[in-house]
């Protein structure tokens, strides 16, 4: 009897091992390799791969078909956080939401997190399928710098609400407007946006923080790219790490009576913690400037605040 029981346990153990091996192989088969979708030779006119081998996404460098084939099988949700307070809420929010509803991750589940300082009537938008929105009222004191308030509020809501609801999270400024499809090519663990203006300049001229005592300090001769703070993303945990590091940097600088911008702190963060994917200037082009030949396809335009 004892022998039979041992044999039964052995058979059960082998069955579990085979089952585990089957699902392990299946998951490996479903894993998307960079070479499956990224075609850097498609754009010889621009930088398509960083020195740490992260892809720089331009139109013409990715296979939308392969990406769609992979992500359509995945059960994921993406969050898009936008901060619309004060005078920026009325003239920009409706344009932002309408364009994002139309062009951002069309056909995939998206939760729009709208962060406002007062609860006003939201614009009437006919939401596409798989879309929903949530409004968070910003309670942080407004005497702080606007970026500090934004990132402090974002970090708080990632911890309290967002991290349990989405797999990817992006933070954008309300002055942006989507002009063409922004799809699953932007998804990644830690996604940075190249600055449209500074991408075409020499690194020596980048406006990094040069005061050694600042937490945002990057020495002369160092640095990779200049990143734009208007569009950042990744997993909720990575976005939370970025926000917390920025806030810690601000506190450090205040103690030394220094004041460095959010974008400079962001560039220091990406200098130390290399992004796993970079978005080309096509994903945030300044609408006041005519795009150069390299920017063939403007996906997102940054509107000028001077117009309002």
UniProtKB/Swiss-Prot annotation:
Presence of keyword Transmembrane helix: yes
Disulfide cysteine pairs (residue numbers): none
Keyword tags: Glycoprotein, Glycosyltransferase, Membrane, Signal-anchor, Transferase, Transmembrane, Transmembrane helix
A GO cellular-component term linked to this record: vesicle
Glycosylation sites: 75
Co-factor remark: Binds 1 Mn(2+) ion per subunit.
GO aspect biological process, one term: carbohydrate metabolic process
Main location: membrane
Entries under InterPro entries matching the protein: Glyco_trans_6 (IPR005076), Nucleotide-diphossugar_trans (IPR029044)
Endpoints of the signal sequence: none
GO molecular function, one term: hexosyltransferase activity
Pfam families, A to Z: Glyco_transf_6
SUPFAM superfamilies tied to this protein: Nucleotide-diphospho-sugar transferases
Active site, per annotation: 263 (nucleophile)
Residue spans crossing the bilayer: 7-23
Cofactor section: Mn(2+)
EC number(s) recorded for this UniProt protein: 2.4.1.-
Subcellular location: Membrane
Stretches assigned to the Lumenal side: 24-308
Organism domain of life: Eukaryota
Sequence similarity: Belongs to the glycosyltransferase 6 family.
Protein's name according to its UniProt entry: Glycosyltransferase 6 domain-containing protein 1
Organism from which the protein derives: Bos taurus
